[in-house]
Amino acid sequence: MPPDRIVSGTYICAAAITRSQIVLENPPEGELKAFLEVYRKMGGQYKGNSGKLLVNGKNVQSPVKLLETSVYPGFPTDLQSPVMAVLSTIEGESCIREMVFEDRYKAADQLRKMGARIRVQGNEAVICGVKTLHGAAVQAQELRGGASLILAALGAKGVTVLEGYSFVQRGYCLLYTSDAADEGLG
């Protein structure tokens, strides 16, 4: 299967929200340009090397004044929810302006259950980052919003219970599940 820019971006968000490092093999680095610019604004670092992308999220701590979604090659609307989860953990105020789809902030209500401070008005979401999110019972209502809830759970203290995981499985075949662990894949 060819590398996917949305899946790659989501994994980079996992490194960002956990303030850790990962290596992506054969990512579509050229297609990630707009996303990587935002990642760098947040304080993330990356380096391409021999078909690998070395990603360091340890210094992700800067809010993003304004992030606007756009059609390719702009910032992908499908990475807006995952980035919202990351911005929820960066102290300071960030703003996302959704320019592609209406009603794209379904994950915001669920992230609020985890302690995120997000105000949605029309096509804008203002995120006032908090130091730490906390676990909660949350409901995925669509694929990318569900991915953002998993990311938030990775960066949260406590247990998060996610209902609606089947939405997420449609787009992320290698996320950890008990079945994958039983087969030695987790």
Question: Residue locations for each model-derived region?
Answer:
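A short, hydrophobic C-terminal helix/tail in secreted or cell-surface proteins
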Residues: 180-186
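Short, structured segments at the rim of ligand-binding sites
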Residues: 1-179
